[in-house]
Design a protein with these regions (language model features):
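Carboxylate- and glycine-rich phosphate/diphosphate-binding segment that chelates Mg2+/Mn2+
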Residues: 1-59
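A short glycine/serine-rich beta->alpha loop
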Residues: 51-54, 76-83
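Active-site His/Glu-centered metal-binding helix of metallohydrolases
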Residues: 61, 65-69
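Small-residue-rich helix-loop
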Residues: 86-94
Length: 181
């Protein structure tokens, strides 16, 4: 939610990135601030749409290309299961690359997003993250759940977002190729 909705939260994550994977950190003042702000932001989004009657939601950021990737890693691979956070993290990076390719997100902000994702190990490249076919199938399924509209939330800056309705398969392929490390 930091990338899409709160530059303040993103800044806190960046400043404290060394400690983010240490569970003890969340007892500290900065750790508590990160948790409190995350909860507040999520509740703000859910408050006005508790029954999900509005299908254009920024909280879908990270949940467009990743659902099938995550499920296939369990069902088809079984060897290297992709945890939810890593699947979502990769989805966020791919979506941010798409936004940058379209000229909405600056290269500087894309770099910040990618660097933070890499630092906290949310950018592991499982072979399923390199499959445009699997990711596009996931996106097609999510589009159905969004009333037949893509409603793809993209960051236009850190903490600012918009939606696109016309993503093409070739754009996803390009973003995936740019994400392979």
């Amino acid at each position: 939610i930091a990338v899409i909705k709160s530059s303040e939260l993103f800044d806190l994550l960046e400043l404290n990135k060394i400690n983010l994977l240490n569970s003890e950190f969340y007892n500290s003042q900065n750790g508590q601030a990160i948790i409190a702000l995350s909860i507040k932001l999520m509740l703000e989004e859910l408050h006005d749409n508790p029954t999900e009657t509005t299908l254009k939601r920024c909280v879908d950021f990270g949940h467009s290309f990743s659902p099938l990737v995550e499920m296939y890693s369990i069902e088809k691979d079984g060897v290297e299961v992709i945890p939810h956070g890593i699947a979502v993290g990769n989805d966020c990076v791919i979506t941010s690359i798409i936004s940058n390719n379209r000229g909405f997100l600056s290269t500087k902000n894309l770099k910040r997003i990618v660097e933070l994702a890499e630092f906290i190990d949310f950018r592991k490249n499982h072979y399923l993250h390199q499959s445009a076919e699997v990711m596009w199938s996931s996106f097609a399924d999510m589009t159905k759940h969004r009333g037949g509209k893509q409603n793809l939330p993209i960051p236009t800056s850190i903490g600012i977002y918009d939606f696109i309705q016309d993503l093409k398969y070739s754009e996803l392929e390009l973003a995936i190729s740019q994400n392979i490390k």
